[in-house]
């Protein structure tokens, strides 16, 4: 059936039903376009770094890898070993100078144990996000879920087992406050072999996949048309 014929056939249907069908058609079209856009990036994943030309990554030692392995310039990666979200305040002036369009927050592994609960951590992270929004109101903020730890790390430190709880609390906080969230759960399972032997840090081959997931999150959710 042609597009014109299809629309003519809708004339005999209840207007609310027509509206719903048209919205569904538009949503499916947008979803297909998004899927094609994502696949195009995955098919040529080394081009993902072009997407970070106006972005800054904040985070801990795992985020350091973005610059350590020369994927991104060090000026665009404000991260250091052992860093926690309480360090965000100290990056404000550098962020203002860089004036990025996107800020990716890649923290968490060092924050475990510093807060009374996963909810306390999520609440504190929200305070930092509000600070960033006040100081850099034009920037889009994306929160990366905490990447997991694997053996032998989890045998040495049981705190790592709390990562799923922290992820759930942060994701809920982001959804409630309109903050973009990059869920790395499935990605980390798919590429679990790309962790360093210590079970915490990452091999360089993981970074393009993580970067792509961050970029996908930065595009936002597809609104119900």
Spans of features found by a protein language model:
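N-terminal secretory targeting modules
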Residues: 1-53, 68, 221-225
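A short helix->loop->beta-strand "cap" motif at the edges of active sites that frequently abuts
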Residues: 136-140
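Alpha/beta-hydrolase-fold catalytic nucleophile elbow
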Residues: 106, 144-145
């Amino acid at each position: 059936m042609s597009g014109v014929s299809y629309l003519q056939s809708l004339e005999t249907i209840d207007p609310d039903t027509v509206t719903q069908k048209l919205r569904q058609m538009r949503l499916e079209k947008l979803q297909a376009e998004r899927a094609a856009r994502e696949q195009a990036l995955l098919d040529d994943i080394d081009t993902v770094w072009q997407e970070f030309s106006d972005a800054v990554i904040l985070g801990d030692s795992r985020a350091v890898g973005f610059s350590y392995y020369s994927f991104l310039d060090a000026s665009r990666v404000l991260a250091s070993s052992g860093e926690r979200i309480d360090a965000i305040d100290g990056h404000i002036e550098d962020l203002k100078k860089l004036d990025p369009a996107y800020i990716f927050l890649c923290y968490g592994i060092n924050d475990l144990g510093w807060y009374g609960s996963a909810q306390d951590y999520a609440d504190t992270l929200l305070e930092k996000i509000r600070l960033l929004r006040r100081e850099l109101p034009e920037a889009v903020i994306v929160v990366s879920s905490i990447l997991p730890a694997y053996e032998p790390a989890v045998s040495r430190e049981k705190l790592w087992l709390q990562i799923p709880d922290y992820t759930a609390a942060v994701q809920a906080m982001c959804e409630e406050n309109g903050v973009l969230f990059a869920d790395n759960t499935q990605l980390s399972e798919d590429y679990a072999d790309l962790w360093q032997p210590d079970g915490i840090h990452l091999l360089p081959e993981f970074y393009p996949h993580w970067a792509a997931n961050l970029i996908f999150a930065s595009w936002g959710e597809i609104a119900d048309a």
